[in-house]
Amino acid sequence: MARVKRGVTAHAKHKKVYKITKGFSGRRKNTIRAAKAAADKAGQYAFRDRKRKKRTFRALWIQRLNAAVRPFGMTYSVFINGLSKSGITVDRKVLSDLAINEPAAFQAIAEKAKAALAA
């Protein structure tokens, strides 16, 4: 059986790890042991934060909506209640975008929600 030298495979594996840790600082980018650990941890953070990003953005939309409906004399929860009573099914992302980019359209929606609460 022929002798297999491991240099080519090892170099390829190391190169793969270094590609992931490019941009990291200190030993974490150029020492294989530290780079492997850093790459693993980066993967864990990436996985966790892909889930967390969804929560964070929903919270941001809610904060924006709360701020946007205050001038109409409502809080966020009252506004959402009014929307459900008036049968308006627009999600928070779109409502938040409307509040920022189309204030007139958002005002019309807010007034409909307020009218549904009064009725």
Swiss-Prot record:
One of its GO terms (biological process) is ribosomal large subunit assembly. This is Large ribosomal subunit protein bL20. SUPFAM superfamilies: Ribosomal protein L20 (SSF74731). Belongs to the bacterial ribosomal protein bL20 family. The gene is rplT. GO terms for molecular function: rRNA binding; structural constituent of ribosome. InterPro entries: Ribosomal_bL20, RIBOSOMAL_L20_CS, Ribosomal_protein_bL20_C. Binds directly to 23S ribosomal RNA and is necessary for the in vitro assembly process of the 50S ribosomal subunit. It is not involved in the protein synthesizing functions of that subunit. Keywords: Ribonucleoprotein, Ribosomal protein, RNA-binding, rRNA-binding. GO terms for cellular component: ribonucleoprotein complex; ribosome. It comes from Nitrobacter hamburgensis (strain DSM 10229 / NCIMB 13809 / X14). The keyword Ribosomal protein applies. CDD domains: Ribosomal_L20. It comes from the Bacteria.
